[in-house]
A protein has these predicted regions:
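Short polar catalytic/cofactor-binding loops
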Residues: 7-10, 34-36
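Cytochrome P450 core scaffold surrounding the K-helix E-X-X-R motif
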Residues: 38-45
Length: 170
């Protein structure tokens, strides 16, 4: 499959990588849209993202996709669901992971399935991103491009809460 990589000099390249293999608690997702993150993606391209120094690297994290296959324990996602944040976990051949969502396919993890099978938080199998990988319900009426903006909105809302802003405050 095709993915977008960056080298240590900031050169972008469309590359071929293997289609990800999903596990029993994961689903395979076909990418529909992926936004450009001014923070993460741009820092990875310019080599300034803290502790991310192994290049070449697969880029992208603000993705939306459609579930096309799922593992036998997955209950939070159904085939055809539109989901947030499919990633490529771990290294893919010579490429390290900058989350890798600028790829044709990614993986989402079913947090409930992991937890119910003894692989919850604190285990090597679990990733905290599984909590954020959620279904975009059809009744929301969002296109895939619009849905990818939810990632940015979540980050903004998190910052507002972290700084303690309240309603009706200047």
């Amino acid at each position: 499959m095709k993915a977008l990589s960056v080298d240590q000099n900031g050169k972008l390249e469309v590359c071929d990588v293997p289609k990800p293999v999903y596990g029993d608690c994961q689903a395979l997702v076909k990418t529909l849209s992926c936004g450009v993150c001014n923070g993460t993606d741009m820092k990875l391209i310019h080599g300034s993202f803290k502790n991310m120094t192994h290049y070449p690297m697969l880029l992208g994290h603000e993705a939306v996709g459609q579930v096309v296959e799922k593992g036998k324990y997955v209950t939070s996602f159904e085939i055809g669901d539109i989901v947030l944040l499919p990633f490529l976990y771990g290294d893919v051949g010579k490429y390290s992971s900058g989350w890798g969502a600028y790829a044709e396919y990614g993986i989402v993890g079913d947090a409930k399935a992991y937890i119910s099978h003894g692989m919850g938080p604190g285990t090597k199998e679990f990733d905290d991103s599984f909590y954020a990988q959620t279904v975009i319900k059809p009744e929301y009426g969002l296109t895939a491009v619009e849905a990818s903006m939810i990632v940015t909105f979540r980050e903004v809302l998190s910052a507002i809460r972290r700084f303690g802003f309240q309603a009706n405050q200047d």
